[in-house]
């Protein structure tokens, strides 16, 4: 039986859920074991299934290994480069992604279709060797639940046994064969084509769910794993920018990264007002006011997804946040007050402002921000000394 895990105060607890969608045309019960995570040491099977589902949506039922592996690399691109997620020591998708980025200087936000086409059509011998190495296990092991009786006790011949059986066993998802150009391919059986196509969304969600569980174990304390599996969606910071404009006008604050005033002349030279995330958005995945820093667009672009030197900027950040906190409390901006209340774990923000000193506010902000900052550093986010 598959399990879904629910979070209770940071502890992940198992809760039984039903099997994959029922069917009287395919062996769905055996299929439900293809992503059995008891001994899983890499993301390959989840990404292989996601690649299969995408190809089927495009009405491709006879697919070469390289196309599916190329899709797997494309799917892993954002989680690895944009969100710095660890895939564990046994997962070689990371090596492929890093090789492509280092060799061809492709951006972390590279268009998915262009990236797929580039990987699939690239003639780089080193890259193609790395892609081929990824095909030695997953196409076969994915089918292993269908052939357990035949492979029990085998170690060195499992892939060969599964390949041969896949050609004659009508129950398994696809057959593995070699085409006239000596390329390995799979041909998805018609009944499985219908099942996978008709249940695309459910099975996609199942694969992502299994992926979240796998990655969560290897990225302890990293927030929002489920939201870090795909390219980030465009966000609208209009409301946050409006509030910060009011805070700037009320408090006459300067840009903490450059020390410059927010004047017309500086806007003309350094770009319009822009909201930066002190700890990168691609790590925290939210736009709450306590992590936002007003700066100039050009400066924000320069900072990008990096962290700044903690010791050099944390006091300036705390001072900025105290002014923002005081503003939203005085102006009764309830949404932003709630964000500070959740961060600082306080019941009454107004009472806190009246009774606590600015030094106590600094201390509480640092207590919350420093652990998140350190986890982001350990996750691989770069630290730069300054932006001036």
Protein language model features and the residues they cover:
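Mixed-charge, low-complexity interaction segments
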Residues: 2-243, 311-328
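Active-site-proximal segments of catalytic enzyme domains
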Residues: 232-238, 252-254, 260, 268-274
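Short, intrinsically disordered, charge-biased short linear motifs at domain edges
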Residues: 239-246, 280-284
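Short metal-coordination and nucleic-acid-contact micro-motifs, chiefly zinc-binding Cys/His arrays
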Residues: 248-253, 288-292
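Histidine-centered nuclease catalytic patch
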Residues: 259-294, 303-319
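Long, His/Glu/Asp-enriched segments that create or flank divalent metal/ion-associated functional microenvironments
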Residues: 297
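Active-site loop ensemble at the mouth of alpha/beta enzyme cores that anchors a bound cofactor
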Residues: 300
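C-terminal structured domain segments
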Residues: 308-384, 388
């Amino acid at each position: 039986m598959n399990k879904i895990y629910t979070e209770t105060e940071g502890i992940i607890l198992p809760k039984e859920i039903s099997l994959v969608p029922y069917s009287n045309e395919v062996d769905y019960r055996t299929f439900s074991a293809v992503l059995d995570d008891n001994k899983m040491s890499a993301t390959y099977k989840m990404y292989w299934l996601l690649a299969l589902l995408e190809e089927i949506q495009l009405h491709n039922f006879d697919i070469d290994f390289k196309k599916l592996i190329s899709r797997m690399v494309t799917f892993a691109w954002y989680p690895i480069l944009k969100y710095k997620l660890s895939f564990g020591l046994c997962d070689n998708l990371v090596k492929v992604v890093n090789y492509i980025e280092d060799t061809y200087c492709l951006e972390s936000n590279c268009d998915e279709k262009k990236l797929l086409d580039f990987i699939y059509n690239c003639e780089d011998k080193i890259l193609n060797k790395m892609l081929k190495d990824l095909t030695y296990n997953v196409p076969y092991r994915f089918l292993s639940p269908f052939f357990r009786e035949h492979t029990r006790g085998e170690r060195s011949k499992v892939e060969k046994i599964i390949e041969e059986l896949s050609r004659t066993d009508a129950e398994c998802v696809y057959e593995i064969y070699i085409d006239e150009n000596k390329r390995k391919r799979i041909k998805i059986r018609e009944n499985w084509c219908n099942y996978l196509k008709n249940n695309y969304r459910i099975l996609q969600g199942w694969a992502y769910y299994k992926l979240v569980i796998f990655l969560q174990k290897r990225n302890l304390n990293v927030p929002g794993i489920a939201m870090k599996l795909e390219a980030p969606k465009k966000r609208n910071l209009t409301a946050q920018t409006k509030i910060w404009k009011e805070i700037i006008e009320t408090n006459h604050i300067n840009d903490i990264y450059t020390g410059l005033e927010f004047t017309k002349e500086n806007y003309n030279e350094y770009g319009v007002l822009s909201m930066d995330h002190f700890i990168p958005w691609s790590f925290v995945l939210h736009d709450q006011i306590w992590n936002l820093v007003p700066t100039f667009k050009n400066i924000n672009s320069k900072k990008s997804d990096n962290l700044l030197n903690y010791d050099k900027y944390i006091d300036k950040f705390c001072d900025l946040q105290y002014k923002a906190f005081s503003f939203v409390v005085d102006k009764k901006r309830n949404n932003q007050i709630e964000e500070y209340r959740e961060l600082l774990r306080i019941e009454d923000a107004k009472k806190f402002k009246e009774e606590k000193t600015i030094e106590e506010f600094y201390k509480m902000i640092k207590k919350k921000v420093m652990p998140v900052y350190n986890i982001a550093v350990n996750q691989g986010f770069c630290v730069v000394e300054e932006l001036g």
